[in-house]
Amino acid sequence: QLLDRSKKPVIATEAGEVVLERARETLRAYDNIRESVAELKGEIAGRLRLGVIPTIAPYLLHKFIPDFVRDYPKVELEISEMVTSDIVEALKRDRIDAALVASGTCGEGILEQELFNDRFYAYVSPENPLYERQNIRIEEIDLKDLVILSPGNCMRDQIIELCQARRSMPSHYSFESGSLDTLMRIVDCTSCLTIIPEMAVEYIPSDRRDRLKTLSKGATSRKIAVAVRRTYVKLSLIHISEPT
């Protein structure tokens, strides 16, 4: 029995779920073969569903999309902004084809191709004692003054690990938002500081650039990568999704 009709709405039984997954795999295989044949003919076409984490999307997509649309007019590009856990689930369930993520955050079953390093900077309030410094060591940061992203954002996890404070890290502020811009606005009106990626630096107004401080050498960067599920074969579409 493939359907459980005793439930409202009707749902698939355990056996039914297996059959449905096999059917999905067959359809994916058919689509992949068809598109691979087109690639062998030298034609890059089809649909590319791309997921992007919130700490990349605002700073990279507007540079990437115009050239992509111009260079690959036969590719239908669909972009979704989502946190890493949702990206992993979407990749495994074939809801997206690829994603731009921080390397090392997707876990088993996902392949990553690293693209570039993205350094971290401190963004420090003029009211904070570290404001007068041009270079800051991580151990000098008072964790009570550090504002970070809400749970679900992989950059939050990276910052917590960087500060070696894990789940117990105290903070005056925590936001249910993936917005680095919000964190910087909070820093502007408090005595706090936050940590931002290099790709966000060019969008900071010139009158606030003095709040940017370099971090001492060490684990003070992330690697940006393209991620796909292991069974994905549309390699030419993945190649063209790499920002230049």
Question: Which residues fall in each region the model found?
Answer:
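A short LG(V/I)-centered, amphipathic sequence patch enriched
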Residues: 1-14
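Immediate post-signal peptide segment of exported/extracytoplasmic ligand-binding proteins
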Residues: 41-48, 142-143
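C-terminal regulatory
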Residues: 75, 85, 89-93, 107-189, ...
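Paired acidic/hydrophobic, glycine-rich loop segments that form the ligand-binding mouth/hinge
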Residues: 97-101, 192-197
